[in-house]
Amino acid sequence: MISLESQVLERHLHLFQDKSILFAGGINDDFPQQIRQYAKSTDIWSWYFDYARTQSAVSFSVVSDKTADLIVYYWTKNKAEVQFQLMQLLSKAQVGQEVLIIGENRCGVRSVEKLLAEFGEVGKIDSARRCGLYHFQLQKIPHFDLNKYWKIYESEILGDLNVYSLPGVFSANELDNGTALLLSTIDTHIFGDVLDLGCGAGVIGAYLKKQNPKTKVVMTDIHAMAIESAKRTLVENQLEGKVFASDVFSHIQNKFDLIISNPPFHDGIDTAYRAVSELIKQAKWHLKDGGELRIVANAFLPYPDLLDQYFGSHDVLAKNGKFKVYSVRA
């Protein structure tokens, strides 16, 4: 089953005929494989490891150095992410580069005309499945400097810890309330091997490492920008730790004394529980005897039942009007 966006693109297969094509953005299906019979070649650039690991010929990286006759960009709801990716792609292109931009109307794809007007001609060529399809031709190559996209934030809660983040990373500009509540439960008595799963910019793992220098911290995420951000957060604060891509536990083999997380519950603009459900269901296999899983979540989410199902019972370490910090032990 292909996405609504790909269903619209399917109406325009003649545009792919005998061209080298680079797919980018929020693509999440196997449409590139399905059109290989029409195209000269297909490549995919994705920031999302959960997608990249299930598809062939996907480049999982912060920036792309690939070129193609036609770029097909899948719009996402994260405006900072879209702006970064399109500017980076166009900075590597030649004048005359053709781009198709497809996205759901509810994700704000209409704003593509304003975003790209300075750099060429853009116009809508189709509207269906609650999506808009736009054609763009490059006339002015944008300047792109990765360093200008870095954001740094501080917080009284974090002490002298500085957090570095790139576009598209959760809570990229400030410490969010859920993470702040989770950090309030971290003391100086944590030891051993620690996994910060879904690390984002690395604030949880870095804060924990700073409070407990003898711990061995591993941080993982599915988002390329999060991984790059977490690595820099560690380096800039002179902290040691391992950071790598993993779709929940897909690339994690070790067992830990503590698995800690502010897990995502938004997938695009829909609420999704897959990652959190997998985290809770599989955590016991990645905890040492007596090891702890500690997560923060919106109080309305049905995680207590799931925690009790797989661990027998749970404790609430902290709560406020919106969030709760849950703890279970293997």
Roles of regions detected by a PLM:
Residues 81-156:
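N-terminal auxiliary segments of SAM/dcSAM-dependent transferases
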Residues 100-120, 124-127, 270-329:
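Conserved Class I SAM-dependent methyltransferase catalytic core
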Residues 93, 252, 286-287:
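A generic alpha-to-beta junction signature in SAM-dependent methyltransferases
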Residues 127-193:
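SAM-dependent Rossmann-like transferase core, predominantly class I methyltransferases
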Residues 59-61, 244-246, 297:
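Short loop/edge segments at beta-strand edges and connector loops
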Residues 70-80, 197-202, 256-269:
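Conserved proline-anchored active-site loop of SAM-dependent methyltransferases
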